[in-house]
Amino acid sequence: MKPTLLLLAAGMGSRYGGLKQLDGLGPNGETIMDYSIFDAIKAGFGKIVFVIRKDFEDDFRNKILSKYEGHVPVELCFQSLDALPEGFQCPADRVKPWGTNHAVLMAKDVIKEPFCVINCDDFYNRDAFQVIGKFLADLPEGSRNSYAMVGFRVGNTLSDNGTVARGICSNDDKGNLTTVVERTEIMRVDGPVCYKDEQGEWVAVEDNTPVSMNMWGFTPDYFEHSEAYFKEFLSDPKNMENLKAEFFIPLMVNKLINENTATVKVLDTTSKWFGVTYSADRQSVVDKIQSLIDEGVYPNKLF
């Protein structure tokens, strides 16, 4: 069975003005998302599912979905504040979405096969899709609790225009993930890659340290775990009182690992990540895409 690609496209970029999901960066106005979908099709994915906001649907259908017709089946799911389990109500003052794992849950009725989750505004590059696509395609039929994460080498994921936030990963001797620790300020400091610790000190890490770029491989049983844990999350009064509390994928993954419920294989990739974290990054992404086209990695026009 071909795996499915799940794109999380309901969030808006906080650091970069404008609807960055729709920003044309390729020569014919292609978005980063278009390149991800092209790479996924090449890597053997058979269906694309988007999670978006309902009020974004018309724009999305007209500007995005129409171009994929005839290339790959697509489905839309919607993330909203009131999409909560029975018995729970969204606090009246909350405006922030419930987080990446809540977005994943929105696709539970349309995904019945192994799937890969990605952000829509990160350029992951071809090798990353091939690595995760192979892992998912090779899973035995009916596989459960055997997941994966593409571990990008931190030195391949930096911005020239400021710090980036990344989940720094540790794994055991079998290559399985043991922890993901979110570090919100990572950059090169006088040569080495460093993150700022809780005391405000710079701590150096090796360039090839794996980090999470939110590229995960799951089987459909992940939805069951997520539904159960989301109820626990909502039952905790502090998560309801804190209007910015979010149900993130690493929160769920860490719980499953700590309870020995699931294993998450860290898959190495040579891919260099790029994205528009800051407005000043935009031109460098345009230039990098053009150089990949010049090298023959992508055609001039994707779809």
Where are the model-predicted features located?
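Conserved N-terminal catalytic core of the sugar/cofactor nucleotidyltransferase
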Residues: M1-L7, P27-V117, Y124-N125, F129, ...
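Active-site metal-binding loops of divalent metal-dependent hydrolases
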Residues: M12, D121-D122, V154
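N-terminal nucleotide-binding beta1-loop-alpha1 segment
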Residues: M1-L19, D23
